[in-house]
Amino acid sequence: MSGVARDELRVKSTSEIFTPTPLVQEVLDQTPEKYFTDPSETVCDPSCGDGQFLGEVLIRRIENGIEFEQALSTIYGVDILEDNVELCRKRLLGKNRHLEHIVEKNIVCADALRYHYRFDGTDPYKTAKDMQFDKLFG
């Protein structure tokens, strides 16, 4: 369940809809296993919200033996609302505050339809089409 208060006015003004956890798990259960077992695979959620999908991806990667820092460093997200971005970052970090620099670069507040996907020093003029993510959710 999401950590942001979802009053009727906010939902109406932002059109945000959050994916229930059972549906997130069902979608990920149908995702090829390599996205959870290969530490070099990258994942991006262009409408990450509070991190439902990305958090579950991180959990599955760790359960498959990928070190936390490596798993975290290949997960990317974009959301248009700052409070969602903050919640996503917190969800992914847990108690690992010393890795905050990773989520500050990889989880960004922007309009995913207009964002140039500049993560961690990549070319700011690349478009989403030009970026090479191994798996996109959202």
Where are these regions (language model features)?
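SAM-dependent methyltransferase catalytic region
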Residues: 1-138
